[in-house]
């Protein structure tokens, strides 16, 4: 996750108010995720990833958990919480690498040739996919060949 700050990941999840705590370290964030994040983080994350596109927000929410699961439980399962944190980390890294929240949103939701013409936000739903997206973003951030 370095050099990405925990606070930036928290912002993508909706902040301390939405998460219900304010972790400042990776250890604290991991413990918060392991307990299960509140269901509200799904809509906050979706809004941060695609605020002006209802269909894209639905896609992002579906990457975390099903609508039926959200209706049944107030908290996400640990597995769904990990997915939410992973996607929030990618949203935060895209903002950092691209320097602009709007540019990051466009990049996350547009098919990318280095990701098999898939949308980066969708590729990042798996651990391996997130690593691929992180590599592309780090190359962008540090002006390396993409």
Protein language model features and the residues they cover:
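Non-transmembrane "mature" sequence context
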Residues: 1-146
């Amino acid at each position: 996750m370095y050099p990405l700050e925990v606070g930036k990941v928290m912002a993508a999840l909706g902040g301390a108010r939405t998460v219900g705590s304010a972790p400042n370290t990776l250890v604290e964030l991991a413990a918060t995720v392991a307990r299960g994040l509140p269901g509200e983080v799904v809509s906050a994350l979706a809004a941060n990833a695609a605020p002006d596109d209802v269909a894209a927000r639905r896609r992002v929410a579906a990457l975390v958990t099903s609508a039926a699961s959200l209706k049944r439980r107030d908290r996400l399962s640990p597995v769904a919480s990990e997915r939410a944190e992973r996607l929030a980390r990618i949203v935060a890294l895209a903002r950092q690498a691209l320097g602009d929240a709007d540019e990051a949103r466009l990049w996350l939701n547009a098919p990318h040739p280095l990701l098999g013409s898939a949308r980066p936000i969708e590729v990042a739903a798996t651990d391996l996919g997130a690593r691929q997206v992180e590599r592309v973003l780090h190359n962008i951030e540090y002006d390396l060949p993409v």
